[in-house]
Amino acid sequence: MKKRVFAMLMAAVMAFSLVACGNKTDNGGDAADTAETIKLGGVGPLTGGYANYGLSVQHGAELAAKEINAAGGVNGKQMEVNFQDSQGDPESAVAAYGKLMDWGMNVCLGGVLSGETASVVTAAKADDVFIMETTGSADKCIDGNDKAFRICFYDSYQGTAAADYLKDNALANEVGVFYQSDNDYSAGLYSAFTAECEKTGVTIKETQTFTAATATDFSTQVNALVNSGVKVVFIPIYAEEASTFLTQAKGKFAEDVYFFGADGLDGILGKVSQDVTIADNVLMMTPFAADSADPKVQAFVKAYEEAYGATPDQFAADAYDAVYTVKAAVEAAGGSTSGTDLAAVMTSLTVEGVTGTMTWNADGNTNKAASAILYKNGVGALFGQNAAESTESTENTDTAE
């Protein structure tokens, strides 16, 4: 017993010495590989107006870890999930990341919103901590860190896919746009969408904007879009602002007008729970549909509903897939949790998740197909044809499920 205690103390001293010398690679890799648990850390808004996103990500990650642990873990190691509240603020996200590093985090699940994700990815660059980003979608939010990969679609893909979806499903030849000009997520989707519309021959007939400071009264923008006579309004915004827009727009547009958005609209029904018909005719691009007949999806939805009393959204599904992808990567890397080792195997993986079949490019972006959900009377269901995969896949040799 004394020999064991002495050995443990010596190991702790050696690990501390490596940290003191600034050898981040060893801290994130070899030392972590001898632990009995794989510590997954996540950052996101658990309080405030965007808490629905953060809580969904937290719950999806925790459910996956629980299932993996019950099945024997990863190479005999158990997974542990620790989520820290960022309140959606990039500076708070960096502080939360620091707390997770102090806790002994081996793998980071990144941030939830794009702004905080960029801050976390930057902070993690020197630590050799692998980042399996769940839902931060801004194109550049994982740039500059070759150990950062993501589960979710990136914004320019979503904008491009949305424009193609309009054309492929013959929804409209003329559209209106309503977006937040001072938000990277919203502005990024807008830019990609309009560029692709120009290529496909879809005309942007009316464009209206708002900022964070003007996100309470959209009457002027609503009236302009109504008067334009468009049959589709592209709204690449978050559910919080979308609920305000849709509430103020209710009854003003023709009944056959669609409001088309991307993953930021997830959770819209919860935001308009006082009258779910406010979300009627909302179309949302997504890789996940809770009503899918896929057995994997059905099992996930059932387990999530039993655990949390709610139907999982795309944010929960992305996080769930992220944890299973970490499992696949650790196994492919021979049990290592080193950021360098995990990043090295990512482009060789194929993961069959609840958000689809996923592969990854060297730039960290995923390849998988997108669908659209149409909301009617508080129920979302698959609509139209699926969009093509996000980018051309690289060659993949390993499969993990």
Show which residues each predicted segment covers.
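Short, low-complexity disordered leader/linker segments with a strong preference
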Residues: 1-39, 70, 387-401
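Beta-alpha junction/loop-to-helix N-cap segments that form part of ligand/metal-binding clefts
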Residues: 25-30, 52-59, 71-142, 210-216, ...
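Extracytoplasmic "Venus flytrap"
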Residues: 34, 38-62, 84-91, 112-113, ...
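Extracellular glycoside hydrolase catalytic/binding regions
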Residues: 96, 127-164, 168, 289
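Periplasmic-binding protein-like
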Residues: 100-112, 131-134, 176-179, 229-239, ...
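An alpha-beta-alpha
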Residues: 148-209, 232
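Extracellular/periplasmic periplasmic-binding protein-like sensory domains
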Residues: 249-320, 380-381
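Segments of small-molecule ligand-sensing domains
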Residues: 306-316, 327-379
